[in-house]
UniProtKB/Swiss-Prot annotation:
Keyword field contains Nucleotide-binding: yes
Membrane-topology descriptor: Peripheral membrane protein
Task of the protein: Has a central role in coupling the hydrolysis of ATP to the transfer of proteins across the thylakoid membrane.
Segments forming a coiled coil: none
Source organism of this protein record: Diacronema lutheri
Primary location: plastid
PANTHER family associated with the record: CHLOROPLAST PROTEIN-TRANSPORTING ATPASE (PTHR30612:SF0), SECA INNER MEMBRANE COMPONENT OF SEC PROTEIN SECRETION SYSTEM (PTHR30612)
Spans through the membrane: none
Protein name: Protein translocase subunit SecA
Keyword vocabulary terms for this entry: ATP-binding, Chloroplast, Membrane, Nucleotide-binding, Plastid, Protein transport, Thylakoid, Translocase, Translocation, Transport
InterPro entries xref list: Helicase_ATP-bd (IPR014001), P-loop_NTPase (IPR027417), SecA (IPR000185), SecA_CS (IPR020937), SecA_DEAD (IPR011115), SecA_motor_DEAD (IPR014018), SecA_preprotein_X-link_dom (IPR011130), SecA_SF2_C (IPR044722)
Length: 891
């Protein structure tokens, strides 16, 4: 049903988009004769039209046509009709599903240009910094050529650099930088320290990775707390003494641990305590067991430089700076014997689900979105449209084969690899984690098969783009962990641009090394280069000239070295050299690339004849999307290719999630260990298991979204109030308002006491201790006053006291009262919000128990959250009032 609805919706929209594309194509003859200056002038004309009230939808055909022409002139790349359709989908605030190799990067600049014309910034969001930097320096030049400013936000930028880049028309950055900048902006002490300028339109590349896969992991800014590290080591020792099913049970599906009575008694005996729960030791022990049972080195994390580094299960990359919460990270540190880090207190947090909903307009691109169409619509109100492919997919996806044991599976993977390699076909082997990638690498080494290994380990990840770019060469073998967000196409025959830049870098670095020893003959260097790269005689003179030039020009080697490395990274046919040295580099680039283009085209034809790129999958992922991303690397742009998955009944997904019927069938067949099972029944059973996991994960994300929505409403109230503090120039009115509400709260609290004397004494104590009145009040004065009279009396006293406070502070230094009030207001709201985040986390963890009382946990959470928040907002007023009134003594 859902597929039919999606198909009909996509089809009706497709007719509309095709009509727009026809208009764009008709305008091409108008754009062609225009000079570069005339093309740029169009941008000013569009902006004027928008200022005069014209809708950007009306100028879409002409704007897209302009970008297409500029792209052809600057990059030598002309948008296909299907790419124009992709641009229309993005402009309509939808998700464009585009297959691998269909040019998503080029598509994004179409709606980015159009929407930036209105003067509001467009954020193009990528999953890693390499892609953000690459795209801003490549396709970003088209936008710059047309007169738009292009910004780039990277992790190592300071505040001033961020502020400058966020002012640009189009900004390339990562999802994590956007989220953390938002959180940091809401912790600043001065509005001038903020870096972001609002959320207008975001185009998210690999949108499924950001909005689906990372939805469960909140962005958190925290500060360290003092930690008793020995408690984690003690818990680890206790966990090691336990045996599974004797002292505890585990739930593999949900990664939960249950300590039974035997385990509790043993723990209490080992620790010498009466109850592990009474002393909160139970939580530490449960985490230690989770670390032992569910978290595996080189799969879930790496040990690097005495630290635990998390590996992203979806992309295979390390997550720098991320830590598991609730003491789990410390438990894993204790397990691995590295330094146990401090526990942290959350200062600010947000999920991507709620962060990206800030944008007035949101869209995204990916090769795999339809499987999650329901979630995109439900959570983000984003429809998914499939972009027609430019050329028919020519890939053969073979049936999955399943072996009884892991040993038999790896043996089959090896034999398949040897067979494909003997044919000369390029081979890409996908693995689910670092550990498995190294198993395959070890097997290939045994047979002396040269290969490239790409996983989360820094020594392997450093040359990621080059490894992927050359994975389509004849006879190449590449092992890679999950392929999501790799961002580089695999071109059959090799990528001439990467090969050219690789050769230039090698030449340059070799020359730099030779500068330390000026006696190294040029011929020896040239011969070394010939060994590494095929340096033609045509290039020989250029290389010799470059050696002489470098040896004479190096006055500040380190600075020049960095500059030349960046020059090589960014150079292309449209590069404009500014001196003789750059002219030489440009000349060398053009000649070298010309050679590689010829070689790669010739090699591509050979690889096509052999059958193209072959994909081997070594395990099915929980999500079908990740499997499809791996498959999608073969068969791009009409090229031939094939894929095949090799599985085992000992694989996690099959072992835990497939039905008993499949396992019983295998037992009845009584197969040999190396005899595989294949066919529709097996594939359907595995796919059914994946669908169940996907649905379960969707329910988890949906629940997280529902719970985080409650916190998000509170976050909005707090951040709006904080922004109000930042924008005020005079705090007197606000402080008096806070003091009046404080009096109301105190009087209401005292009214609960039935004893008049207790009421009077309580109010006097409040005046003395909480608001630090500089004089005493006689309780007898209050004994005969009504509630309203007490309020009037106290408000008068508080106001007089506040006025005296201001006079005293101003006498010490002009402006001191304003400075202190500003600081105390921010201190109060920040401290209370930190406490609230901790309270809400504890509430979320405990609220599930209410289900046993036949109550809806979410509804209970909403009620309790509202009650706690009401108390905390009062606490902001009380805390700020107390700090301001008691900042110095009147004595």
């Amino acid at each position: 049903m859902l597929k039919d609805i999606l198909r009909k919706t996509t089809q009706s929209d497709l007719y509309r988009y095709e009509n727009i594309v026809k208009k764009i194509n008709d305008l091409e003859r108008v754009m062609k004769p225009l000079t570069n200056e005339e093309l740029r002038a169009k941008t000013l004309g569009f902006r004027k039209s928008i200022e005069d009230g014209q809708s950007i939808d009306n100028i879409l055909p002409e704007a897209f046509g302009l970008v297409r022409e500029a792209s052809l002139r600057i990059l030598g790349l002309r948008h296909y009709d299907v790419q124009l359709i992709g641009g229309c989908i993005l402009h309509d605030s939808k998700i464009a599903e585009m297959k691998t190799g269909e040019g998503k990067t080029l598509v994004a600049i179409l709606p980015a240009y159009l929407n930036a014309l209105s003067g509001k910034s467009v954020h193009i969001v990528t999953v890693n910094e390499y892609l953000a930097k690459r795209d801003s320096l490549s396709v970003g030049r088209v936008l710059s050529f047309l007169g738009l400013s292009v910004g780039l936000i990277l992790a190592d930028m300071n505040r001033e650099e961020r502020q400058e880049n966020y002012k640009c028309d189009v900004i390339y950055t990562t999802n994590s930088e956007l989220g953390f900048d938002y959180l940091r902006d809401n912790l600043v002490g001065n509005p001038s320290e903020k870096v972001q300028n609002g959320f207008e339109f975001a185009i998210i590349d690999e949108v499924d990775s950001v909005l689906i896969d990372e939805a469960r992991t909140p962005l958190i800014i925290s500060r360290s707390l003092e930690t008793l590290n020995n408690i984690y080591l003690t818990a680890k020792n206790v966990a090691q003494a336990f045996e599974i099913n004797t002292h505890y049970e585990i739930d593999k599906r949900n990664r939960n641990v249950y300590l039974n009575e035997s385990g509790s008694k043993l723990a209490e005996k080992l620790l010498g305590v009466s109850s592990i729960y009474k002393f909160e030791t139970g939580t530490y022990i449960l985490n230690a067991i989770k670390a032992k049972e569910f978290y595996t080195k080189d799969k879930d994390y790496l040990v690097m430089r005495n630290q635990i580094t998390i590996v992203d299960e979806f992309t295979g990359r390390i997550l720098k700076g991320r830590r598991w919460g609730d003491g789990l990270h410390q438990a894993i540190e204790a397990k691995e014997g590295v330094t146990v880090g401090s526990e942290t207190m959350t200062m600010a947090s947000i999920t991507y689900q709620n962060f990206f909903l800030f944008y007035k307009k949101l869209s995204g691109m990916t090769g795999t979105a339809l499987t999650e169409a329901k979630e995109f619509k439900k959570i983000y109100n984003l429809s998914v449209d499939c972009v027609p492919i430019n050329k028919k997919v020519n890939r053969i996806d073979k049936e999955d084969v399943v072996y009884k044991s892991l040993y038999a599976k790896w043996k089959a993977v090896l034999y398949e690899s040897l067979s494909i390699h003997e044919q000369g076909r390029p081979l890409l082997i996908g693995t689910s984690n670092v550990k498995n990638s190294e198993i395959v690498s070890g097997l290939l080494k045994e047979y002396n098969i040269k290969h490239s290994l790409l996983n989360a380990k820094p020594e392997n990840a450093a040359n990621e783009s080059e490894i992927i770019a050359q994975a389509g060469r004849k006879g190449s073998v590449t092992i890679a962990t999950n392929m999501a967000g790799r961002g580089t196409d695999i071109l059959l025959g090799g990528n001439p641009d990467f090969l050219t830049k690789g050769e230039l870098r090698y030449i340059f670095r070799s020359i730099v090394l030779s500068l330390d020893d000026m006696t190294v003959p040029k011929n020896e260097l040239i011969n070394n280069l010939k060994y590494k790269y095929v340096i033609s005689e045509k290039n020989r003179l250029d290389v010799e000239e470059l050696i002489d030039k470098l040896k004479s020009a190096y006055t500040v080697p380190e600075k020049n070295r960095i500059g030349v490395e960046e020059l090589i990274e960014n150079i292309d046919e449209s590069f404009q050299p500014v001196d003789k040295f750059e002219i030489l580099i440009q000349k060398l680039y053009e000649k070298t690339k010309e050679r590689y283009v010829r070689e790669c085209l010739a090699e591509k034809e050979e690889v096509i004849q052999l059958g193209g790129l072959h994909i081997i999958g070594t395990e099915k992922h929980d999500s079908r999307r990740i499997d499809n991303q791996l498959r999608g690397r073969a068969g791009r742009q009409g090229d031939p290719g094939s894929s095949k998955f090799f599985l085992s009944f000992e694989d996690r997904l099959i072992e835990i999630f497939t039905t008993g019927g499949l396992k019983n069938m295998i037992k009845e067949l009584d197969l040999e260990d190396d005899q595989p099972v294949e066919g529709k029944i097996v594939s359907l059973s595995i796919e059914s298991a994946q669908k169940r996991i996907e649905d379960k994960n969707y329910q988890v994300r949906k629940q997280l979204f529902n719970y985080d929505n409650v916190l998000n409403l509170q976050r909005k109230v707090i951040y709006d109030e904080r922004d109000r503090f930042l924008s005020l120039t005079d705090f007197k009115g606000l402080i008096l308002q806070y003091l009046e509400k404080l009096v109301d709260d105190v009087v209401a609290e005292m009214e609960r006491s039935e004893n008049q004397e207790d009421k009077s004494r309580g109010i006097v104590l409040f005046c003395k201790k909480f608001i630090c009145l500089p004089y005493s009040i006689d309780p007898e004065l209050l004994s005969n006053l009504s509630k309203e009279e007490i309020k009037i009396f106290l408000n008068d006293q508080v106001k007089i006291s506040y006025e005296l406070k201001e006079i005293e502070l101003e006498s010490l230094r002009v402006g001191l009262s304003q400075s202190l009030e500003y600081a105390f207001l921010l201190q109060s709201i920040d401290q209370v919000w930190k406490e609230q985040l901790t309270r809400m986390e504890l509430l979320k963890e405990s609220i599930g128990w209410r289900a046993y009382g036949q109550r809806d946990p979410l509804l209970e959470y909403q009620k309790e959250a509202y009650r706690i928040f009401a108390i905390q907002t009062r606490k902001i007023r009380h805390s700020a009032s107390h700090l301001i009134m008691c900042s110095t003594s009147f004595a």
